[in-house]
């Protein structure tokens, strides 16, 4: 197989280490974090929530709403869903793309 020099060259590289720390990010999104232990609670921004049904892990950024079922593994997934963005747009908005 020959090397194809016409292949698209990527101008941006995703760097997970540049993502904001989960606790800071979630607070900047207006979430009031409560509770102790590994999982914190907050009202869910993905549906009309009066009780804190969203669970958040501050070490990994993982999240899950016990009421509406929305979930993801990190702040990037949260940002994508909250702002209806694709991966590249969300990574760029969070400063995790090296261009």
Task: Please describe what each predicted stretch is.
Residues 1-99:
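N-terminal structured subdomain of primase-like DNA metabolism proteins
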